[in-house]
Curated annotation (Swiss-Prot):
This is Putative ZDHHC-type palmitoyltransferase 2. The lineage of its organism: Eukaryota, Amoebozoa, Evosea, Eumycetozoa, Dictyostelia. Residues 56-81 have a biased composition (Low complexity). It comes from Dictyostelium discoideum. It catalyses: L-cysteinyl-[protein] + hexadecanoyl-CoA = S-hexadecanoyl-L-cysteinyl-[protein] + CoA. The DHHC domain is required for palmitoyltransferase activity. One of its GO terms (cellular component) is Golgi apparatus. The chain crosses the membrane at residues 178-198, 210-230, 305-325, 349-369, 410-430. PROSITE patterns: DHHC. It is a multi-pass membrane protein.
Length: 446
């Protein structure tokens, strides 16, 4: 195993030559211990057996040591042949970067270009470094030869902790305030304009009370599901594997044959069906999409609340639309009989027309989204998987991946999101069957 040694001595004429010296590392030096890494721009850190056994890394980077190394190449090579000492280079986030070219310590753009071009090795996990495996067919190659990363993928993943149903902070309240405003204001107006007149009339008092109860129940369901959907953690996880595990089980950052992937942004392996959200800056389990109106991702643990919110909002729009039409008919009938209307009723009639138009536009949009969610859930797919499936429909092997998510029937597929107890499907309760199953160490989100 080879690592590149980069001395961090600025102003040294031999810095480029010393940065390409190779150090042979024995796996026994790792001892399956976690290696804690400080942060710094290309910090050269010397590690010996005692440091590894104590799970510590002592930063012994000083100019005297680097000057001695730069002035005497023979001594430098002798030190590198010592299997009890190694040098690793870290960027600010603790990621080891092979030095393909010499660049300044403050050149973040060039560092990012290396990462984007997959020039980095296995990244760190929770501020711990996973020493990478680099191809080395010839130990005598000169400093201009580039090193490529192995593309072998990991075979197991274990010791993974799932954080279920954690409440996250309400965060930005802008979009959420708008949604609550759009729910409550029409309801209050309809309650006073369309329902209240029925309650003051003896003949229609019972009808008014029934409509009051139904409208209140619908609004409570909308607000409750909206709150749960926006504040429930959609599903996150913490990789607790020892960093030294990835020495023997490197993993690719792109899709492989077994579809195990490494997230270069989160610096850990992504479980199956997990995707990284650029807005939440984390990987979300069984991610469907990120909703700006909720300021949250729709994923494993809150998709039911999202679908219920769309469902009750659609029902409420239809119900309120019916009440407004009935109230409009009453006003028009009153006008035809009395040949006149008070100015107050004329104002209400004008607002009625505007509100009806808003309900029609909102209803079409929300019902279309609800239909899309129902169609995808019935197939056992998420929105992201559906879009990937359309883009890669010519790849049979890729399409076969999603067939295992289909449980064979619509009821079975719905039970994955809503739970096995069908009589609780329309209530904002936690699905009783959300769990993580493990088969031969691989994580499957069901």
């Amino acid at each position: 195993m080879n690592l590149y040694n980069n001395s961090n001595s600025s102003g040294s004429s031999n810095s480029s030559s010393s940065s390409n010296n190779k150090t042979n590392i024995d796996y026994n030096d790792i001892n399956n211990n976690d290696i804690l890494t400080p942060k710094g721009y290309h910090t050269s850190i010397y590690i010996d057996d005692n440091d590894l056994n104590n799970n510590q890394i002592i930063n012994k980077n000083n100019n005297n040591n680097h000057n001695r190394n730069n002035n005497n190449n023979n001594n430098n090579n002798n030190n590198h042949n010592n299997p009890k000492k190694m040098v690793i280079n870290l960027n600010p986030s603790g990621i080891f970067i092979p030095l393909m070219n010499d660049f300044d310590d403050d050149d973040d753009d060039e560092q990012e270009s290396l990462i984007k071009n997959n020039k980095i090795t296995i990244p760190t996990i929770n501020s711990q470094i996973a020493i990478p495996i680099l191809n080395n067919n010839d130990n005598n190659n000169n400093s201009n030869n580039k090193t490529e990363q192995t593309t072998t993928t990991t075979t197991i993943i274990k010791n993974t902790t799932i954080f279920n149903n954690k409440t996250i902070s309400f965060g930005r309240i802008g979009f959420r305030s708008i949604v609550i405003f759009l729910i409550l204001v029409p309801y209050i107006y309809i309650l006073n304009f369309a329902i209240f007149p029925w309650t003051v009339n003896y003949e229609t008092e019972r009808k008014g009370k029934i409509h009051s109860f139904i409208s209140m129940a619908l609004v409570i369901q909308m607000l409750c599901n909206y709150y749960l959907c926006s504040t429930t953690d959609p599903g996150s996880f913490k990789d607790t594997i020892s960093p030294s595990y990835y020495l023997l089980h490197p993993i690719s950052s792109t899709d492989s044959n077994d579809h195990k992937k490494w997230c270069n942004k989160c610096n850990h392996q992504k479980p199956e069906r997990a995707h990284h959200c650029r807005y939440c800056n984390r990987c979300v389990l069984r991610m469907d999409h990120h909703c700006q109106w909720l300021q949250n991702c729709i994923g494993l643990f809150n998709q039911k609340y999202f679908v219920l919110f769309l469902f009750y909002t659609s029902i409420s729009i239809i119900y309120f639309f019916t009440l407004l039409i009935k109230r409009s008919i009453e006003l028009v009938t009153k006008y035809t009989m009395e040949k006149t209307l008070p100015s107050f009723d004329l104002l209400h009639l004008f607002l009625l027309g505007i509100l009806i138009i808003i309900l029609i536009i909102a209803g079409i949009s929300i019902m279309a989204l609800l239909w899309t969610q129902i169609a995808l859930i019935s197939k056992g797919l998420t929105t992201i998987e559906h879009e990937d499936k359309k883009r890669k429909y010519q790849q049979p092997n890729y399409l076969n991946l999603y067939k295992k998510y289909d449980k064979g029937s619509i009821i079975s597929n719905f039970s994955i999101v809503f739970g096995n107890l069908s009589f609780l499907w329309l209530l904002p309760t936690i699905p009783n069957n959300l769990k993580i199953t493990s088969k031969k160490g691989d994580i499957f989100i069901v």
